[in-house]
Amino acid sequence: MPRVMWKNFHLCFPSNLTKPSSSPSGATSDDPNRPSILLINNFNLLYDDSSAAHRRLSKPLIHDVEPSSTFTASTSTAANSSSSSASYDDSDNYGFAPDDDSPPPDLTAVLASRRFFFSSPGCSNSITDSPDLRCRDNYDTATRLLTGGTAVKHYVQSPDPYNDFRRSMQEMIDAVTNAGDLRRYEFLHELLLSYLSLNAADTHKFIIRAFADILVSLLSDGHRIS
C-alpha cells in the first residue's frame, strides 16, 4: 500500500509543474522580462527556494562602471581643484587682486583716541570709570600749599608733639621772615590750616597751642602783622 501511494504522489500536483512545456524559440528565451519556469524533480525542491532566489538575483542591481571612465572623472575633478587652488594661491586676500600701491594702515587715530588703552585706575579698579574722575575725599582733605613751598606728608610718633610743632612752625616763620613776607596775615592763616589738615585730629590741640604761643611771641617782639 505505501509503495502505491508513493508512486501516485506526483499526481497530487498540477501537470504543468512536472512536465515542462515545449521549448520556446531562441528569441523568447533571451527575454529577461519573461518569468522563468521552475522544474520540480523531487519532493525536496518544494521547500528549497534557493534556485528560484538565485534566478531572481541573476540580474545585477548595480551596473559596473568602467575603470577608464572613473579614472577620467577623477582626473578631471583633480585638475579642476588644482586649477582653482592655484588661482587662489596666485592672488592675495582670498581671490582679490593685490594692490602694491596701497599705503600701510595708519594707526595714529586709534592710538590718539586711546579707545583700547586704559590708564591707571583711580578710586576703584573698574575699567569703566573715567580716568578724569578722582576721589572727592582726597580733595576734601587736601589743602592749598604755602606760597613757594613744598609739603611732604610724613608721619612721626613724637614723645613731645607740642615742642615739635612749635619748632617746625618757628623754622617756617624764620624762613619767611628772611624773605620779607612775614607782614602778611594770609601766610599765618595758611600755615595753621596746613598743619591742621596734614595731621590727625588728636594732635590739633598741640598745633593750636604751639601756633598761639608763636603768635604771642611775634606780637611781643614788635612784629606788625597786616
From Swiss-Prot:
Residues 68-104 are annotated as: Disordered. GO terms for cellular component: nucleus. Residues 68-87 have a biased composition (Low complexity). The keyword Transcription applies. Expressed in roots, shoots, stems, flower buds and siliques. Keywords: Nucleus, Repressor, Transcription, Transcription regulation. Transcriptional repressor that regulates multiple aspects of plant growth and development through the regulation of BEL1-LIKE (BLH) and KNOX TALE (KNAT) homeodomain transcription factors. Interacts with KNAT1, KNAT2, KNAT3 and KNAT4. Plants over-expressing OFP12 have no visible phenotype. This is Transcription repressor OFP12. It comes from Arabidopsis thaliana (Mouse-ear cress).
